[in-house]
Design a protein with these regions (language model features):
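Hydrophobic, well-ordered beta-alpha structural blocks that scaffold small-molecule cofactor pockets
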Residues: 2-57, 70-71
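Adenosine-phosphate binding glycine-rich loop
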Residues: 89-153
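Short, glycine/charged-enriched secondary-structure capping and boundary segments
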Residues: 13, 35-37, 75-78, 101-103
Length: 153
């Protein structure tokens, strides 16, 4: 999704070496004026993300849509692609509702628990910029763990 948190997050991630693809089904949120730093911007059907982008085992996916149903569509498709990282933004209730639907679809509890829900590190973030910072921190940490460079200071 291309909402307020994503608008804060993408510049941070690009600045620290991530390549960002933004997808939203609303052109008002998915356009070069909103995301000038994004490598690619996609306006498309969130029920068919595979038609627009290929997700693989080296990818990080941040799911930040505007509602339960869209989170469900995206998380269901993303889990099937087995990326390195999946993070889902939302309240505990929203996350529980989506997780229950995924379980009923046949995804295992282990698969669902691989997802970082809620996305980001627990820093007491409240504003979109603070939430984006907590997400960027989590992604940097996961990248460091993957490359063997993670050390707790």
């Amino acid at each position: 999704g291309g909402g307020h948190v994503a608008q804060e997050l993408v510049p941070m991630l690009v600045h620290v070496g991530f390549r960002c693809v933004v997808m939203d089904d609303r052109e008002i949120f998915a356009n070069p004026q909103v995301f000038p730093q994004a490598e690619r911007i996609i306006v498309g059907d969130l029920e068919k993300i595979g038609d627009y982008v290929s997700i693989g085992p080296r990818d990080y996916v941040c799911i930040m849509t505007r509602g339960h149903q869209f989170d469900y569509y995206v998380q269901r498709q993303t889990l099937a692609c087995h990326p390195f990282y999946i993070g889902v933004m939302g309240s505990r209730n929203k996350i529980r509702v989506v997780a229950d639907k995924l379980l009923s679809d046949g995804f295992s509890l282990e698969e669902i628990q691989r997802c970082h829900m809620p996305i980001g590190t627990a820093i007491g973030a409240e504003t979109p910029a603070e939430i984006a910072l907590s997400i960027a921190g989590e992604l940097i940490m996961e990248r460091a763990k993957r490359t063997g460079k993670y050390k707790k200071i």
